[in-house]
Design a protein with these regions (language model features):
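SAM-dependent transferase fold signal centered on methyltransferase-like domains
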Residues: 1-275
C-alpha cells in the first residue's frame, strides 16, 4: 500500500529507494531523501503521514549524525513538529528525542545479543550509552549493575527517564560526562563487560575501555570497516583490533552489526582481556 501510494508521485525505483531510507520510531518517521527528489519532499512527507497509521510527524534528515553529542538536523515535512516520542523494543519502553540525542532502531538485533550475553552479577560499563537502550535491555532481566555514560546532557536525562519507566531486575547508574575522565576517576578495573558504542572513534577510547575492564573481562569493540567482500568484514575487524590493542586478548568472535555505506560496515569484535 505504501509503495503504491509513493508510486503515484515517484517512479517504482525512486519509491523503493525511499522506502529503504526511512526509519519509523514510535509515531515519527525520519526519511533520508536523495538530492534528485528534494523538490518533492513536502508531498513525500504528506504521503507518508497519510499512509502510515500511527505516525504523527514526518521529518527529513538534513544532516548526518555528528558532533560530540551525536545529534542530527531534522526538517519537519508533515504533521507535528515534535522530535520526542516513545519507542518500544523487546518489552522495554524508551522515550527518545530523535534530533537531540543519539538513537538508532537499526541496532535492535545487537542490543538483544548483548542482553542475552549479560550474566547476573556482572558490572557493565556502557561508555557511549545515548538514551540508555543497551543498558536497560541488559538490566531488564539480569541482576547486573550498569554504568551508563554519555557526554550529551539531554541523552543522560532521557536515560534517567527511561530507567524510571522500566521495571528492571538490575541497577543502572546514569552518568553525564566524558567517558575517559569518568573511568579514570571512578571506574578503573570495575567492569566485567564493556561496550564501546562509538564505532567511528573507538580507537581513541580503546585504552579507556581496557582501563575500566577487569582482567578476565570482556570488551565489545565496535568499529567501522571497509571491506570489498562482506564476508571479510569480521576478520578485518579482528585484525584491526589486534594491531591497535595494548593488552593480551582472546578473540571470542566478530560480526557485522549493520551496513553503513557501500562496502562499509559497522562491526563488533568480542574480546576477553588478561592484564
Amino acid at each position: 500500500m505504501l509503495k503504491k501510494s509513493l508510486e503515484s508521485i515517484l517512479t517504482s525505483e525512486e519509491s523503493d529507494e525511499l522506502i529503504s531510507a526511512f526509519d519509523q520510531i514510535g509515531n515519527i518517521i525520519i526519511v533520508r531523501i536523495p538530492d534528485a527528489l528534494l523538490s518533492k519532499k513536502k508531498i513525500i512527507g504528506e504521503t507518508l503521514l497519510n499512509q502510515v497509521k500511527i505516525v504523527k510527524s514526518v521529518f527529513y534528515q538534513s544532516s548526518a549524525v555528528e558532533g560530540d553529542f551525536r545529534t542530527r538536523n531534522l526538517e519537519i515535512l508533515a504533521g507535528e513538529d515534535n522530535t520526542e516520542t516513545e519507542y518500544k523494543e523487546f518489552n522495554c519502553k524508551f522515550i527518545v528525542d530523535v534530533e537531540n540525542a543519539f538513537f538508532s532502531p537499526r541496532l535492535s538485533t545487537e542490543r538483544e545479543r548483548i542482553a542475552k550475553l549479560t550474566q547476573d552479577g556482572e558490572v557493565i560499563v556502557n561508555m557511549f550509552a545515548g538514551v540508555g537502550m543497551f543498558s536497560i535491555m541488559a538490566a531488564k532481566k539480569k541482576k547486573c549493575t550498569v554504568y551508563s555514560i554519555d557526554l550529551n546532557p539531554i541523552a543522560s536525562k532521557l536515560c534517567e527517564r527511561n530507567i524510571a519507566i522500566n521495571k528492571l531486575a538490575g541497577e543502572i547508574i546514569s552518568i553525564n560526562g566524558d567517558a575517559s575522565k569518568i573511568i579514570q576517576d571512578q571506574l578503573m578495573d570495575k567492569s566485567d563487560r564493556t561496550l564501546t558504542l562509538l564505532p567511528e572513534r573507538s580507537d581513541e577510547f580503546l585504552d579507556s575501555a581496557i582501563n575500566t575492564t577487569k582482567s578476565g573481562g570482556i570488551i565489545h569493540y565496535y568499529s567501522h570497516i571497509h571491506a570489498d567482500k562482506k564476508s571479510e568484514a569480521g576478520k578485518l575487524t579482528e585484525e584491526h583490533y589486534k594491531k591497535i590493542t595494548s593488552v593480551k586478548s582472546e578473540i571470542l568472535g566478530s560480526k557485522i552489526v549493520r551496513a553503513v555505506g557501500p562496502r562499509y560496515y559497522q562491526t563488533v569484535v568480542d574480546v576477553k582481556i588478561t592484564k
